[in-house]
Amino acid sequence: AEQLVIDYSEKSVIVQKEKLIAKNTDENLKLIFTDGVQQKEINQFISKSQAFVAGLMHDIGGVYPNHQRVEKAELFGIELLTEEREFPLIIHQKLSKYLAREHFKITDENILSAIECHTTLKENFTELDLIVFLADKISWDGGDNAPFKEGLLTALSVNLQSAALYYIDFIINDGLKVAHPWLLEAKKDLENQLS
């Protein structure tokens, strides 16, 4: 995979934005409103532009390889959980929020929240959080051969919460490497909402 180096000079940020648009638009953003997560399911408080921006920015923290993520998070003053230190891949969601806010000047707290929890979801999630979380799973890096995709799409035909709970149960039963506390809290919230 292409590694991006960002020095955050004005020119580098422009290049980064162009690469993000080229890399993510087709792969991820259109999926927010396809494959079952349809516009009709998004209430009037969430705009397509919020979902678009969150979808565009959600993985920018991935510019830092796993072996640099703890160091970068500490440098940026990002609080890390034990589970994130143990499995640095997860840190990219917090780095993405930081970069979106500090370097791309995103100020909408709803967008920043969705970026920050797109991998794990979290307790008291918003509808935008849930949509970006699901779009991220539908557009899984492994392509269409995601082992959970068919079941997730079936659950999505019921509602967003059912799809999210299906995915979380699937990865836990499949031997999740690290159980992030936010994921477990989101699971409880989903179970309560669906009971």
Curated annotation (Swiss-Prot):
Coiled coil: none annotated. InterPro entries: Diverse_Catalytic_Enzymes, HD/PDEase_dom, HD_domain. Residues 24-141 form the HD domain. PROSITE patterns: HD (PS51831). SUPFAM superfamilies: HD-domain/PDEase-like. CDD domains: HDc. This is Uncharacterized protein in pepC 5'region. It comes from Lactococcus lactis subsp. cremoris (Streptococcus cremoris). The lineage of its organism: Bacteria, Bacillati, Bacillota, Bacilli, Lactobacillales.
